[in-house]
Amino acid sequence: ILILNQQTVTAYLDKGNEVQVALVDFTFKTKKLLFATNGFANELTKGAVHPARAQVLITESIQNLVIKGAFHLDKGYYYFRNIGDRILLGGGRNLDFEAENTSEFGQTEIIQKKLEQLLKEVILPNQDFQIEHRWSGIMGVGSSKNPIVSQLSDNVYCGVRLGGMGVAIGSLIGTELADLV
């Protein structure tokens, strides 16, 4: 099994006995092709999946961290969990849906400030912390909350539109996709 990350598929052709796949820098042939691109699946699904940026941060180690588990705030627009003795916090796209409906990676001041405010005032009040790292990911969302797990042609399949729940349901969708093959 060959897994290619951070590649852009420019075209593919299912020829019945093989699939030809063209990437930006090279092409290859395979017997089966499975797409799990999620937020980058708009063209693949004829518009059924749209990108939505998710901004995330993680703290440095926090002495005597008592928070354990995974939590959601504000109708799920914010989510946090402990990772060992650190807090991972993400969300806030509801502050600027238009700007966050993008496939561009990056952070915005309005969302990063809100994430820091939540850490200071709600999640870790009266506790010192430092932010170690910030990043973003691209989720796949659509008009339906149901994921798309389907066969696109004889040898091409997709498992996409996880609706921001990729970490929670990604393994299940992967199993369903494998069962199709």
Where are these regions (language model features)?
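A conserved beta-strand/loop element that lines the FAD pocket in flavoprotein oxidoreductases
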Residues: I1-V9
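Short, surface-exposed beta-strand-loop junctions and turns on beta-sheet-rich folds
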Residues: T27-K29, L95-F97, M165
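Short glycine-/acidic-enriched loop or helix-start segments at secondary-structure transitions
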Residues: L44-K46, A99-E100, A168-I169
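Flavin-binding catalytic cores
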Residues: Q63-L65, N101-S136
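Amphipathic alpha-helix from the class-I
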Residues: G92-T102
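C-terminal catalytic lobe of FAD-dependent flavoproteins
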Residues: E121-V181
